[in-house]
Amino acid sequence: PLCLVGSEMCIRDSNNTMLQLLQGAAVSMRSTRLGTDWTVNKPTSLLTSPLFHVSGLSAGVVTALFAGTTTYIYEGRFDPQNILRVIDKYKITSWGGAVPTALKRVLDEAPNHNLDYESMLVVGGGGAPMPETLIARTKQIFKNVEHNFGYGYGLTESGAITVVNWGDDLNNFPRSPGKPMPTIEVKLIDDDGNEIFDDEVEGEICVRSPSVMLGYYKNQIESKKSLNKDRFLSTGDYGYRKDDLYFISSRRTDLILRGAENVYPQEIEILLDQYDGVAESAVIGVPHDDLGEEVKAIVVLENNKITFDELELYLKDNLAYFKVPSLWEKKLKSLPRNASGKVMKHVLIDQSKNNFVEDE
């Protein structure tokens, strides 16, 4: 997963791994020293992200080397009980790269054990939206975290975290992944490539910094598509800005075109994931003869007493009518995820195209 090219390094991009036979993303090695460090002055950190993922390698290992901290690298299949034992045994003080689904599993397991979690001072998450209920539970279980909880947004091509939110901003705007990190420029562009300066206007997120990749290894065509002449990276993510904070709407490839309306799945997923009794959710677009696409919600429930009608009413109270899913599916098992912890929506879409339904 890692190779050196002169003074640079290559990291395999998980999305391109599936689609393009392991194309590498070359990232400038010098930029890693500029990364904000979750573990400075914290003696022992926990790393659960895979080392072939940018958060594991760059934000985890390399950052720890520069900071001179002790890092416990978790091995093997993710097991919430083992994670809790590691925190207790090694008196872990910081945990960075906590994917929401993994963090939730750990928090669900914590009350079942008589272990000491008071050493934990800092928790940093990412990889997916962080529900407000999960933020509150993290501070409840890890009592000494308080204001030292945060999460951010980034991607392999950007070299790790691009924007980050914690402290007062997180308390006031928990749905935002935050403000740009030092040395990082973020802008929004419309479909014609023009920069958007107004607040609360949707556009594609573009990033420029020393940590942005040099290009896709030995693939100039794709590199030119992703990097413009000013070295701004087109992320493929849609979002908007408000009071200097950025909000992520959806991946460009996830956007659902329902009739003449744009539907951003992440907006719906955040609401569903916050509903008591919903373990996780995914929203996808499925073909529709009249509308082009229809909105479908796939949910994993903790409580089988919850009905789709109940969830639909809840969403109608919080969303525009055209964003409320008209199709629902319940799964008994966890949603399919890649090694980075992200839901593999292409699998769910393929199952829907084949009229596959796991649970009635």
Protein language model annotation of sequence segments:
Residues 1-6, 11:
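Single conserved hydrophobic/aromatic residue that forms the stacking wall/gate
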Residues 21-44, 52-94, 109:
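Conserved AMP-binding/adenylation subdomain of ANL enzymes
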Residues 69, 89-98, 107-172, 185, ...:
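Gly/Ser/Thr-rich phosphate-binding loop
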Residues 85-88, 95, 209-210, 214-215, ...:
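AMP-binding/adenylate-forming catalytic core of the ANL superfamily
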Residues 98, 149-157, 177-180, 284-287, ...:
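Beta-strand->loop->alpha-helix junctions that form or flank phosphate-binding loops
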Residues 127, 154, 178, 237, ...:
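Active-site glycine-centered loops adjacent to acidic/histidine catalytic or metal-binding residues
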Residues 168, 179-183, 194-226, 263:
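Conserved ATP/PPi-binding loop(s) of AMP-dependent carboxylate-activating enzymes
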Residues 350-360:
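Acidic/polar alpha-helix N-cap and adjacent early helical turns
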